[in-house]
Every structure is written in structure tokens, then in C-alpha cells.
Amino acid sequence: MSSAFTVVIPARYASTRLPGKPLQLIAGKPMIQWVWEQARKSSAERVVVATDDQRIVEACQGFGAEALLTREDHNSGTDRLAEVAAQLGLAADAIVVNVQGDEPLIPPSVIDQVAANLAAHTEARMATLAEPIEDVQTLFNPNVVKVVSDLNGLALTFSRATLPWARDAFAQSREQLPEGVPYRRHIGIYAYRAGFLHDFVSWGPCWLENTESLEQLRALWHGVRIHVADALEAPPTGVDTAEDLERVRRLLEA
């Protein structure tokens, strides 16, 4: 099966923790431009920014990116992607990769990897990536999403909680990682087949998705298989807060 794919970058202006986040300047360029440039370095046939704000559309046009204006009332980035897939008239079996608009350091290799993984695993309707958790602070951080997979590499669940809970080890100490437990951090990049996006939107959010604020749980709730692989090149964490923004600025302005 072909692994040709389209990248869509959802970019909301009204971020709760960092308003106007896609347009925040990093080394003289808006953050969304950094993300777009990284996506353009991948093997994607097309890279599209999907936004709910005309200011972001105009900024994208200024540096040559294709941008589509979408509705403001989407429940998640995946819901926004579904609108874009419909606007673009993508075939049901076309692969779409969701690259978060706050990942200015995302390696192009992981974009290619997640698209290729979905193409290779026809039993899955979504694919995503993970990396090992190597310190206990990360493990207990609710801003870090944990993922557990089965022996075939399909997701069993995702959670902000410490998952799985090593009962005996944590009864002794929570100061170090339990031995023999392969804890993994979910990396928020997804590949889908365009036809699946229509189904995803039609289902609407479930209580589990709303409780954890994790859109992928809607797919699991409906029995969708999600393929999870360890990233060949783990990306740095994205920009969620003003502190994250300053960290990325220091890296890219050095």
C-alpha cells in the first residue's frame, strides 16, 4: 500500500495557557511557520494549516503556506482535520497526518514514520508514536500522557495518570522507576485514513475523552485499533506554556 500522505497542522488562536500561540515569534518567525517548515521537510505531498482565525491565515499566506479557515466550535484537532479532509476532497483511503501546531522542533522523520506505519498496518485506522519514560518525575506528571500497548503494538489505553500502577514497587518507594515496567510517553502525532475522520466526528466526544481531555480515547471507546510504535527520533516536548516558549526560543535563537 502506498504511504503517500497529506499533513494537516491544526492551529487555534485562543489557547488557554498561551493566547495567540501560533503567532508567537521565535527567532523572528511565527511558531506556525517553524512547524510548517519542518512538515515541508517530510515526504508529505501537501502541507495544509487548518485554523479558526483569519490572523493565522494571513500570517501563513505571508510565508507561502496553504491555510484553510475552519469552524471555531470543533471539540478537538481531529474534528478540525475532518473538516479539512472534506474541504480537500480526500479519498477515503488517503492518509492524513496530524502535526500539532505547537511543535516547532518536530523532526520530519517522525512525520514520515507515523504515515508509513499506518500504511503498513491495515488492521489499524489510526497510528501514533511513543518513547520510553526514563525518570519518575515524568511518570507522575499529568501533563505527560502515558500509553500501554498490546503484544501486537496496538494501544490498550492512554492516560494522564501513572499507568500501569506498579502496586508492589510503589508501596515501597515512588522515588524511582520500577524495574521491568516499560513505561512510555505518548507523542501527540497521529496518522489517519480520511474516511475514518468522518466516523470520528459522527461519534462525538465520550465521557472518557472529556474526563482525560484526550481525543484518542474516543477512538478506543468505539473499538478503533490504534497502532503505536516507538519513535525513531524522539521529538522535544511542544510549547504549552510561556516557559516552554522561552525554552524553545533559547534553542532556536542560539
Curated annotation (Swiss-Prot):
Pathway: Nucleotide-sugar biosynthesis; CMP-3-deoxy-D-manno-octulosonate biosynthesis; CMP-3-deoxy-D-manno-octulosonate from 3-deoxy-D-manno-octulosonate and CTP: step 1/1; Bacterial outer membrane biogenesis; lipopolysaccharide biosynthesis. One of its GO terms (molecular function) is 3-deoxy-manno-octulosonate cytidylyltransferase activity. It is an enzyme of class 2 (transferase). It catalyses: 3-deoxy-alpha-D-manno-oct-2-ulosonate + CTP = CMP-3-deoxy-beta-D-manno-octulosonate + diphosphate. GO terms for cellular component: cytosol. The keyword Cytoplasm applies. Gene3D superfamilies: Spore Coat Polysaccharide Biosynthesis Protein SpsA, Chain A. InterPro entries: Cytidylyl_trans, KdsB, Nucleotide-diphossugar_trans. GO terms for biological process: CMP-keto-3-deoxy-D-manno-octulosonic acid biosynthetic process; lipopolysaccharide biosynthetic process. Keywords: Cytoplasm, Lipopolysaccharide biosynthesis, Nucleotidyltransferase, Transferase. Pfam families: CTP_transf_3. Its EC number is 2.7.7.38. It is found in: Cytoplasm. Its main location: cytoplasm. PANTHER family: 3-DEOXY-MANNO-OCTULOSONATE CYTIDYLYLTRANSFERASE (PTHR42866), 3-DEOXY-MANNO-OCTULOSONATE CYTIDYLYLTRANSFERASE, MITOCHONDRIAL (PTHR42866:SF2). HAMAP family: KdsB (MF_00057). Activates KDO (a required 8-carbon sugar) for incorporation into bacterial lipopolysaccharide in Gram-negative bacteria. Belongs to the KdsB family. This is 3-deoxy-manno-octulosonate cytidylyltransferase. It comes from Pseudomonas fluorescens (strain ATCC BAA-477 / NRRL B-23932 / Pf-5).
